[in-house]
C-alpha cells in the first residue's frame, strides 16, 4: 500500500502566520505614534483596555472553533448567525481589509529603505515615489506567484521569516532595558497635555496638566487605531483552519500568539519612554524603532532594525497575501461569490482569487503616489473594516449563548461585540464610509453568485445593498466635491488631497 504523506499546516506554521501577520510594520512605529497622543500612564491603561478587548476576541474565536468545528473563518460565522448577506459583508470586508493592509506594508517598507537612501523612495508628505511604486509592484507580483504555487509552501516560508523578524525586536528590547532611565519614564507618567505644533507639523512642545477623566479618555481614543492595528492578523490561524493538520491547533496557536504579541508590544511601546522625553519621541521619523535604536547605539542599530523591518514587512505581506484569497475562496464555497473565485490550480491554490486581489493591490499601489500619509490611510482603513468582521464574530457567539443559555458565551460574545463597536465608533467610521465604495462593487458579484446558484435575493438583502450603495455614492460625491475642511466628513482631507 502506498504511504501518502499527510499534508497540512502545522501548529508552528499556524503560529507563524499569526505572529508574522500581526507583527508587520505597525510595531516599528508604535512608540512614536503613541507618544503623539498618550503619556506612559495612558499607554498602560490603553493596553489594559485593548488587551481585554482582543482577549475577548480570541476567546470568541476559540469558543466557536470548539462548538462549531464545521465552520471556518469570519464569513462562515457571520453567515451562520445572520444569513447570506451579512456573511458576504463580513467576508468581502475581510478581503478589503487584508489587501489594503498590504498597501500599508508596501509604503512602510519603502520608508524603511529611505533610511539608507534618503528621499529616493518616499516623499516628505508620506506618499511614495515613482521608483517605489515600481519596486513594490514587482515584489507584490512575486509574492502572489509564491502563494500561487501553494498556500502550504508559503506558510512554511513564513515560519522561517517569523524567526528572522523577531531578532531585531529582541535586540531593541534588551538595549531598551539596559538604557532605561526611570526618571525620564516617570517624569510625566500620569499627566495629560495639549500639543503645540511647529509650522512643519512636528511637535514643538507639550503643555502639561494634571490627569483628568476626559484627558485619559482622550489618550485611550488616540491609541485605539494604532493598538488595534498591531493585532490585526490574530485570526490568521482561524482563517487557515481548513488547511491545518489538526483543527484543534488553530485554538492553541491563537492563544499562544496573543500572549507572545502582548509581551512584545508592551515592551516596545513603553521602553522608548524611558530613553527619551516625550516631545522628542513624538518627533521621531517613521519608522520609529529604526531611528530610536540608531540614537541608542549608533548606525549599526538603525541598519539592523531597518533590515529587520523590511524582513518583517515581507513576512506580513506574505501572510496577508494568503488571507484575502482564503476569504474569497470561502465566499465562493458558500455560493456568496461566483464559483470562478473558488477554483484551485494544481497546487491547490485559488489562482483566480489571487489574480483579482493582485489587480486591486496594483491599482492602489499606484494611488500611493498621490495620497499623503499613505501608510496611515491604508492601515486605518484595514483596521476599521476588519472591526466590523470582528464585531460580527462576537455577535454570533452572543446569539449562540442566548440560544443555549450559556452565560460564558453570552459574556464573551457581548464584550467582543461591544469593544469592536465602541472602538470603531470612536476612531474609524470615516474609513468604513470610504470602504462602502468597494462594498458596492462587491454587490455585483454577490448578485451574480445568487443567479449562478439559482437562489433568490430577499427584500432585506436588496434593502441592505441599497443602503450601502447610497453611502458609497455619497462617499464618491464628497471625494469629488469636497466637504468643509477639518470636519468629520472631510474625506479629501483624510486622504491628504
UniProtKB/Swiss-Prot annotation:
PANTHER family: AMINO ACID TRANSPORTER-RELATED, ARGININE_ORNITHINE ANTIPORTER-RELATED. This is Arginine/ornithine antiporter ArcD2. It is found in: Cell membrane. Keywords: Amino-acid transport, Antiport, Cell membrane, Membrane, Transmembrane, Transmembrane helix, Transport. One of its GO terms (biological process) is amino acid transport. Pfam families: AA_permease_2. Disruption phenotype: Deletion does not affect the growth enhancement observed in the presence of high L-arginine in different growth media, and uptake activities are slightly reduced. GO terms for cellular component: plasma membrane. Catalyzes electroneutral exchange between L-arginine and L-ornithine. Can also efficiently translocate L-alanine. May function in vivo as a L-arginine/L-alanine exchanger in a pathway together with the arcT gene, which is found adjacent to the arcD2 gene in the ADI gene cluster. Belongs to the amino acid-polyamine-organocation (APC) superfamily. Basic amino acid/polyamine antiporter (APA) (TC 2.A.3.2) family. One of its GO terms (molecular function) is antiporter activity. The chain crosses the membrane at residues 8-28, 41-61, 88-108, 127-147, 160-180, 220-240, 255-275, 297-317, 354-374, 378-398, 406-426, 429-449, 462-482. It is a multi-pass membrane protein. It catalyses: L-ornithine(in) + L-arginine(out) = L-ornithine(out) + L-arginine(in).
